[in-house]
């Protein structure tokens, strides 16, 4: 069996994810090491990601390690992976999804409805900002950057009445007790790929692709391929208030996509489509169709598809 090196960010959550993949590969007879790295996205905490390079800042250094041979694969939270990978790189594996929902986290309040008028809520995405404003336009929404532990510490320091985080990250780190409530997708549609892990490799490394094949989860891969197709066709990034979530039942893939106004001035736009899918190509085609419908609906609603300027500190 082969010897493999995993490139990973050094946050506690990123290391958990890399060690999870390491364990699965080790059980299959591979020798697996870790290469921890601090990315530019981890270092820049005082400016909007949209102003300094977007979510690609979290993967660029890892891709360099793949390119120069220091690492064989990189493990990512799929929602943080840019919709277009550089030439020579491939998404070789999508693993079974954890909880895709967003979590309401607070030390004082049980859920969003219980927050007092004008309460301060911290969130790190324009998507969450837009959806929160659609649910509770009275709230004061403030930027929130940093890794998971940093965000929780800011909440505990009293900077926010509540914060919104991905449920998957909290559950993976054994922090489910911090979740006061979860938002159902009907209330807060997740980001494309949320809750799933993606593994990136150099596209010519067929040996690594073959080693990763047993870790792939076909149903999740179909769903997130459709979601990422929506986002790709919309020009989605961390600087667009876009949500996309797909579910598969009896070979029928249903995609919900939404566009919101972070300022809360325009109504939320939501579209849904379903179709039978059998492979990644048909899932991607359905995602592109949903994106076309969403684009038309946004423009008809008076919205703009230009990427938004996130407030300073916003991711």
Swiss-Prot record:
Cellular component GO terms held in the UniProt record: cytoplasm
Swiss-Prot/TrEMBL cofactor(s): dipyrromethane
EC number: 2.5.1.61
UniProt keyword Cell cycle, yes or no: no
Note: The porphobilinogen subunits are added to the dipyrromethane group.
Any single Pfam family the record assigns to this protein: Porphobil_deam
Function, as annotated: Tetrapolymerization of the monopyrrole PBG into the hydroxymethylbilane pre-uroporphyrinogen in several discrete steps.
Residues bearing PTM S-(dipyrrolylmethanemethyl)cysteine: 238
Similarity-based family: Belongs to the HMBS family.
HAMAP family for this protein: Porphobil_deam
SUPFAM superfamilies assigned: Periplasmic binding protein-like II, Porphobilinogen deaminase (hydroxymethylbilane synthase), C-terminal domain
Pathway: Porphyrin-containing compound metabolism; protoporphyrin-IX biosynthesis; coproporphyrinogen-III from 5-aminolevulinate: step 2/4
Reaction catalyzed: 4 porphobilinogen + H2O = hydroxymethylbilane + 4 NH4(+)
Example GO biological process: protoporphyrinogen IX biosynthetic process
Source species: Albidiferax ferrireducens (strain ATCC BAA-621 / DSM 15236 / T118)
Lineage: Bacteria, Pseudomonadati, Pseudomonadota, Betaproteobacteria, Burkholderiales
Annotated protein name in UniProt: Porphobilinogen deaminase
Major enzyme class: transferase
Keyword Transferase applies: yes
A GO term, aspect molecular function: hydroxymethylbilane synthase activity
CDD domains named in the record: PBP2_EcHMBS_like
Cofactor detail note: Binds 1 dipyrromethane group covalently.
Assembly with partners or alone: Monomer.
Entry keyword set: Porphyrin biosynthesis, Transferase
């Amino acid at each position: 069996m082969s010897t493999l090196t995993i490139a990973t960010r050094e946050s506690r959550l990123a290391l958990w994810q890399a060690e999870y993949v390491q364990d699965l590969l080790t059980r299959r007879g591979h020798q697996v090491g870790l290469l921890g790295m601090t990315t530019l996205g981890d270092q820049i905490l005082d400016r909007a990601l949209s102003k300094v390079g977007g979510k690609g800042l979290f993967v660029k250094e890892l891709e360099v390690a793949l390119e120069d041979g220091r690492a064989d694969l990189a493990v990512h939270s799929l929602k943080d992976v840019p919709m277009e990978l550089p030439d020579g790189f491939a998404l070789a594996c999508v693993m079974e999804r954890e909880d895709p929902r967003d979590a309401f986290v607070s030390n004082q309040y049980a859920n969003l409805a219980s927050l007092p008028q004008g309460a301060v809520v911290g969130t790190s995405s324009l998507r969450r900002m837009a959806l929160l404003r659609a649910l509770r336009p009275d709230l004061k929404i403030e930027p929130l950057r940093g890794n998971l532990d940093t965000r929780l510490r800011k909440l505990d320091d009293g900077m926010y009445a509540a914060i919104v985080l991905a449920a998957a990250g909290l559950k993976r780190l054994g922090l489910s007790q911090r979740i006061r409530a979860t938002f159902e997708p009907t209330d807060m549609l997740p980001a494309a790929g949320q809750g799933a892990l993606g593994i990136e490799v150099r596209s010519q490394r067929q040996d690594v692709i073959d080693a990763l094949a047993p870790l792939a989860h076909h149903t999740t891969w179909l769903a997130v391929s459709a979601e990422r197709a929506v986002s790709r066709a919309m020009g989605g990034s961390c600087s667009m208030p876009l949500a996309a979530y797909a579910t598969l039942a009896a070979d029928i893939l249903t995609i919900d996509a939404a566009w919101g106004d972070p300022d809360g001035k325009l109504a939320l736009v939501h579209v849904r489509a379903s179709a039978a899918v059998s492979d990644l190509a048909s899932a991607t085609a359905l995602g592109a169709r949903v994106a076309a419908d969403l684009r038309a609906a946004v423009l008809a609603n008076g919205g703009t598809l230009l990427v938004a300027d996130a407030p300073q500190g916003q991711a």
